[in-house]
């Protein structure tokens, strides 16, 4: 109780009150524009008519914001293409998009202040390479060997938009800013219904990427706050009345009242929460919850998560979104790999004096393989091959130079091998490599109006082989990447690199 109250007071002391006036500062929108230019995923403030960002537009926007009828006009006429001032010719969508980018910058300020290091706290050294996606796999390899069950969770989404605003009220107590946020959400969807229309959420996500990511991360932060706190501190999870705790406001007061009714529950911590063999990993809207225990124990956690979303976030999620499987008998899709923990036979020769005998035992092994069907599907969607994996030419690239064609094919091939270097079976990668090499040859042959055989005889297959196996020297945290993948190599050696920070490099070049 004291720990939670202390956390709540510390959490409350960092709430921000006066955020709205920053929206009237021109430099805020300049920050938003510079962020879009320097971001790894460039987000340019562009309207549907390709009207780009300028300080003059921002000044006119701020003038309109000071006018009392600006918000009324947008709310009363959300479907009109133009505002009342037809001479200016600005679209209402463009104004809303600029505002959303500036609003996202402003509301991120309180959360950025929380990340500032405290002078009294010991500074934790930061290693850039620890951001690597591959750094999680050695952790899974060490821990999952001792676990029994795994729950693959599809985090419910989308949710009711009003809940997103209510979640921000715990961090930002600025009424005008929250009203402005409601205006954005009301502009892109029907306010009186659940946002089940994927068309409206797609438009909002596409035109307001920064704001959308901020709202979604706030929702995940609040959800994981309860998940982590209750797992560590509470002992009343199995009770049916635990739904009374799932309200953020006056949380400690309700726990204190419940502790009077059931004083014995708060004097001890049961193994249900404090079992050290429980691990939670979240990635790309999904999560993995692995633990050691019985099937009944893991089913409790499954229904706890369902009730958490139902009572606190006020929406119902289907139980089928949480798949509970036994690790030894199933595999799971994780970060582009099909992972499993099978029990492999192991023969051990034991020598005792003059007698020797063999001991046949079964040891669990963390196995990672490449999902060949999914990757061939990506290649087929990008028109490198057919659905069955037969290589074809890419006509859209025939207008490029020979070097550009080779560079694009080579980059995709190296990305595939670099990201999936942790696979325990490399033969699948060699098949994908063959598809890309032959597709590249057919594209070049089509450009020069020749056959593949004639083209390969003229250039030679050694040139393509050398091109696709060439890799840049990448320095990682532990070692230097020097291994080159070729057809004559180890088929079982797994290598995890510490320079991979995004999974999008695997799929997006194919689109």
Curated annotation (Swiss-Prot):
One cellular-component annotation, GO: chloroplast
Keyword terms of this UniProt record: Chloroplast, mRNA processing, Plastid, RNA-binding, tRNA processing
KW Ribosomal protein (keyword) present: no
Residue ranges crossing the lipid bilayer per the database entry: none
Pfam entry (one): Intron_maturas2
Source domain of life: Eukaryota
Any GO BP: tRNA processing
Protein family membership: Belongs to the intron maturase 2 family. MatK subfamily.
Keyword match Coiled coil: no
Cellular location(s): Plastid, Chloroplast
Matches recorded under InterPro entries: Domain_X, Maturase_MatK, Maturase_MatK_N
Coiled-coil positions: none
Protein name, UniProt field: Maturase K
Its biological purpose: Usually encoded in the trnK tRNA gene intron. Probably assists in splicing its own and other chloroplast group II introns.
GO molecular function, one term: RNA binding
């Amino acid at each position: 109780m004291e720990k939670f109250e202390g956390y709540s007071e510390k959490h409350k002391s960092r709430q921000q009150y006066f955020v709205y006036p920053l929206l009237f500062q021109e430099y805020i929108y300049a920050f938003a524009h510079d962020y879009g230019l320097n971001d790894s995923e460039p987000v340019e403030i562009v309207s549907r008519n390709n009207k780009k960002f300028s300080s003059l537009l921002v000044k006119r926007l701020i003038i309109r914001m000071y006018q009392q009828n600006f918000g009324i006009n947008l709310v009363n006429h959300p479907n009109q293409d133009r505002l009342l001032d037809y001479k200016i010719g600005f679209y209402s969508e463009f104004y809303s998009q600029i505002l959303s980018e500036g609003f996202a910058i402003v509301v991120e300020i309180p959360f950025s202040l929380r990340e500032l290091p405290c002078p009294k706290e010991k500074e934790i050294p930061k290693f850039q390479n620890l951001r690597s996606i591959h750094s999680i796999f050695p952790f899974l390899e060490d821990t999952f060997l001792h676990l029994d069950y795994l729950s693959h969770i599809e985090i419910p989404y989308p949710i009711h938009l009003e809940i997103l605003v209510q979640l921000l009220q715990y961090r930002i107590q600025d009424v005008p800013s929250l009203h402005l946020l409601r205006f954005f959400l009301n502009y892109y969807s029907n306010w009186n219904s659940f946002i089940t229309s994927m068309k409206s959420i797609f438009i909002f996500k596409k035109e307001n990427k920064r704001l959308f990511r901020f709202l979604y991360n706030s929702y995940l932060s609040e959800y994981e706050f309860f998940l982590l706190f209750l797992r560590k501190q509470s002992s009343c999870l199995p009770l049916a009345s635990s739904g009374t705790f799932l309200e953020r406001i006056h949380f400690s007061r309700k726990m204190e009242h419940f502790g009077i009714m059931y004083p014995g529950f708060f004097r001890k911590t049961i193994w249900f929460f404090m079992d050290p063999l429980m691990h939670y990993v979240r990635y790309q809207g999904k999560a993995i919850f692995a633990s050691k225990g019985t099937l009944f124990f893991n089913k409790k956690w499954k229904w706890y998560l369902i009730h958490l979303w139902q009572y606190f976030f006020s929406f119902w999620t289907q139980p089928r979104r949480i798949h509970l499987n036994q690790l030894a008998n199933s595999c799971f899709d994780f970060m582009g790999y099909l992972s499993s923990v099978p029990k492999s036979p192991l023969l051990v020769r034991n020598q005792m004096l003059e007698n020797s005998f063999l001991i046949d035992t079964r040891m669990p092994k963390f196995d990672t393989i490449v999902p060949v069907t999914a990757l061939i599907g990506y290649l087929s969607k990008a028109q490198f091959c057919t659905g069955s994996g037969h290589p074809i030419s890419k006509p859209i690239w025939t207008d490029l130079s020979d070097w550009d064609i080779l560079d694009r094919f080579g980059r995709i091939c190296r990305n595939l091998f670099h990201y999936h270097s942790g696979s325990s079976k490399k033969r699948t990668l060699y098949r994908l490599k063959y598809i890309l090499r032959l597709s590249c040859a057919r594209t070049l042959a089509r450009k020069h109006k020749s056959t593949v055989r004639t083209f390969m005889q003229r250039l030679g297959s050694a040139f393509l082989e050398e091109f696709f196996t060439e890799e840049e020297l990448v320095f990682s945290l532990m070692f230097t990447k020097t291994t080159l993948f070729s057809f004559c190599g180890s088929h079982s050696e797994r290598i995890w690199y510490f320079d991979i920070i995004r999974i999008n490099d695997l799929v997006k070049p194919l689109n």
